[in-house]
Amino acid sequence: MLRLAAFLRGMNLGRRRITNDDLRAHVEALGFTDVATFRASGNVILTAPDDGALEDAARRLATGLSEALAYDVPVFARSAEQVRAMAAFEPFSADELAASTGKPQVMLLVQAPKAAARRAALALAPADDLFVFEAKELHWLPSVGLSQTELDYKALAKAIGHATVRTKGTIELIAAKHFGG
């Protein structure tokens, strides 16, 4: 059995509203077990019914949820080990964290970007923001709150592909609560 976290993009934004109970029921109807949700922002912890690849579980979830909800549901899946690694990774120094009024963010990507895409993304970072790539994530320390950032999300998506964003604190809480991290 494969235990994983699925980070769903665009949940509970605009008109795309779903309760955690309904989301859990849809995921269980797709054959996943031990389903738990964390906050109302599309964080689902689950066990896949077989030991297939993580990508297979993500694809099955994305297809099934998109059909059930009648809108596209991009899924960014990570194994328990990957979630613990994201939570433990500390890309920013104490001084950098203290100098920022923004919260550390983790952008989950479908795949690790190639060198040219990384360079393009780094060039898009607003002044005083910090970007650090690690595996299939872009760790971001905005110098201001997200509502004030000058980051061009569309240009960033063009450079590195679509992503979903969670605070580092959310990743840490999921790791601690669901994966013994």
Model-derived features: positions:
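Surface-exposed, charge/polar-rich loops and edge strands
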Residues: 2-181
